[in-house]
């Protein structure tokens, strides 16, 4: 766990890459998670460089990064000092990086909504993309599948 913690700290401490052509993120996931791989493909297709790391103690990483339990999903990523939890659409990660709202530690799609990026489904669910930080959360966008509706 110490090695993973050191890797996370080193990755988050690197100079912001908002000016880089290809935003780079590190994704922590279970080796057996198929939807995580589909979400990673979604991010790559939308111009992100992704470094994936299979870990055995994902909950410990979430705790270390301050992911609220109620926002937990199957994978956790870090990019430019922000946490990305779950099946967040690439457009909202870009928006987070562009807007950089004060006091925000990360963005999340709690659970695993059907139709969200990485969760293909015949019928897509409506779900919220939330920002979180300092013990609070707020809606950032609302989607049905991969289509933003609010």
What are these regions (language model features)?
Residues 64-150:
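Thiol/selenol-based redox catalytic cores and closely related redox-interacting motifs
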Residues 2-15:
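Bacterial N-terminal signal peptides
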Residues 40-60:
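Conserved helix-turn-beta segment immediately C-terminal to the redox Cys motif
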Residues 32, 39, 54-57, 89-93:
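Stable alpha-helical elements in mature extracytoplasmic
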Residues 24-25, 48-50, 80-83:
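Short active-site oxyanion
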Residues 28-30, 53-56, 87, 110-112:
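Active-site-proximal beta-strand/loop segments in catalytic clefts of secreted hydrolases
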Residues 20-46:
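Local sequence-structure signature of Cys/Sec-based thiol-disulfide redox active-site neighborhoods
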